[in-house]
């Protein structure tokens, strides 16, 4: 997200349910190695979510709701403001579904906030925070249903950046911090003679870092980046 790695340390990969459309202004897909900008895990490519911002003065509020089969509900409310050099984005969402089988429910709460300030015509500051919590249940295979296969996961991220834009050159220095709290019950299969689990898997992870890059364009279809 905005060039910052998002994998959960204990799993070594992102938790996809922690990312919602309320974050995204656009999604960039880069093919091939990109470790200079995105770190050592970007050996094969990168999917980068660029967060929302307001590009012109004014106030905009967007409400999205949807309802479908299996009691599926999607909701999202976003307010964006830009006044002079100041801008802000505040979003909240709630999503849920019963799933197409028993013990397959999913419920998610999410919130995102961002503020920005253009110090000059070429330099700006921004800070943001995103927190998501979801509850999910896994019913196991149809032939051997699983009970109590539940998980409760909370993940968050925050960052602060100083950015510059001079036409032919642009860059940023950013600081980021990600965290997650995971509570997982592996469940049990009654048809296999199993009983309820005596313990739960619980983990907490966090990751922080600094990212810097500067890009320059000297002629058409060319870009040189250091970072």
Go through each PLM region and give its residues.
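Short strand-turn segments of transmembrane beta-barrel domains in outer membranes
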Residues: 34, 46, 51-81, 91-92, ...
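Hydrophobic, lipid-facing positions within transmembrane beta-strands of outer-membrane proteins
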Residues: 43-45, 59-63, 73-77, 109-113, ...
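Residue-level signature of outer-membrane beta-barrel architecture
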Residues: 81-83, 117, 162-166, 206, ...
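Flexible loop and strand-edge segments within Gram-negative outer membrane beta-barrel domains
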Residues: 97-104, 108, 124-207
